[in-house]
Amino acid sequence: MNSMKRYIFGNWKTYKTTQEVKEFFSVLNQTKLTKNPDVVFGVAPVFVHLGLANQLERNECLVLAQDANYVMNKANTGTVSYEQLKDIGVNYVIIGHSERRKLFHESDELINQKVKTLLENKMRPILCIGETLEEYEANKTKAVLKDQLEKDLKGIDSSLLKDLIIAYEPVWAIGTGKTASSQTAQDAIAYIRTVLGLLSSKTIANELPILYGGSVTPDNVSELLAQKDINGALVGGASLDPHKFIQLIEAK
């Protein structure tokens, strides 16, 4: 792995009750973690648990949001704005997750607005991109990634990209138990850097954190993180178990 910081982020989706959130942080807070300044970790609970997670956290665990609305002070029933998140100390936000794209029909144009607004307000979007199984089998991975990056980052000043994090999540590997091989993940993320270099600069492309997401577990995380272009992981199921999450954080 290169010399950049390592990011381990857990996406809890719509799992965990209030009691389960308390139990998770009870275990995490009582664990003496290796204090490595180059490892950044956090979890993304549902909106109603963000305040609770912030109150319970005692081990430098970031609290992330799973989405954000890019408008403020408007009549948008059922959403939470970026400013409201920032107001409670949440600065990292997952944007464009494949489940948001598919289940909520989020377009690249909408995702672009969200990413742009977060960056302009000094927040850190975690932009998720990736291909479906059909696209993967048709050898369209590169075309899909290029198209998503061009649309999702359209009109965003390059100077703002220093706060962007990208998560490559092949849709066919999310929640399926299938994991892209470390080489497949490396190749895709290396290509993402190539496209970023064309859209911004080689310096930005080389310094921007890019994570892998898709059935990451304590058993495969070290091999994935050993790849030169992979700077961390966006983890689903394995992040729900505090003991497994700790293993992910402490992985060598």
Swiss-Prot record:
Keywords: Cytoplasm, Gluconeogenesis, Glycolysis, Isomerase. It comes from the Bacteria. CDD domains: TIM. Pfam families: TIM. It is found in: Cytoplasm. Substrate binds at N11, W12, K13, G175, S215, G236, G237. Pathway: Carbohydrate biosynthesis; gluconeogenesis; Carbohydrate degradation; glycolysis; D-glyceraldehyde 3-phosphate from glycerone phosphate: step 1/1. One of its GO terms (molecular function) is triose-phosphate isomerase activity. It catalyses: D-glyceraldehyde 3-phosphate = dihydroxyacetone phosphate. Transmembrane segments: none annotated. Involved in the gluconeogenesis. Catalyzes stereospecifically the conversion of dihydroxyacetone phosphate (DHAP) to D-glyceraldehyde-3-phosphate (G3P). NCBIfam families: tim. This is Triosephosphate isomerase. It comes from Mycoplasmoides gallisepticum (strain R(low / passage 15 / clone 2)). The lineage of its organism: Bacteria, Bacillati, Mycoplasmatota, Mycoplasmoidales, Mycoplasmoidaceae. The gene is tpiA.
